[in-house]
């Protein structure tokens, strides 16, 4: 990928989700006409398109996205291409349930909504790497590509064992030892001092959730 973005125009556009309308090509055709009429010159594609790009594991369908890239380019527009990890496909949750998010009550979520995944899951990370690699290889040098949109919003904390271990690892790097952590969080209050790193759990309505330092650190790492 050697192309650089030098468009001097004011970028005008927004998120566009043609993957939701693939059964209605007449709608997609009208969309392009409306964009030109409104002088839209930039669209973000693929934010929640993972299931349209990889409908089953390892089977990729890029034809529809090829057409959108070419159509946007033909009208003189730019594409901001999103990595689609904000909304994983159903098959991923079904085959690899560890990718589903665990809430602060320790309950494993089922598939649904968005940002409902475990960021720490090795399987989730590998599947994200695979789809992102495919997108980069296919569209990295397309003349319409202006920039990348990484995933989506920050949300969907997970409290599974993977995330709790990452939480403790992060705290060990920050505080070095339990004595420093106990002091920073003032864990002598109510007699809750830690004596082992395995005792350090993230805030939970079922346990500790009134320690301000703990809450602040959780917001900093955002597990």
Predicted segment positions?
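Short, well-ordered coil/turn segments that N-cap beta-strands
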Residues: 8-12, 39-41, 73-79, 141-146
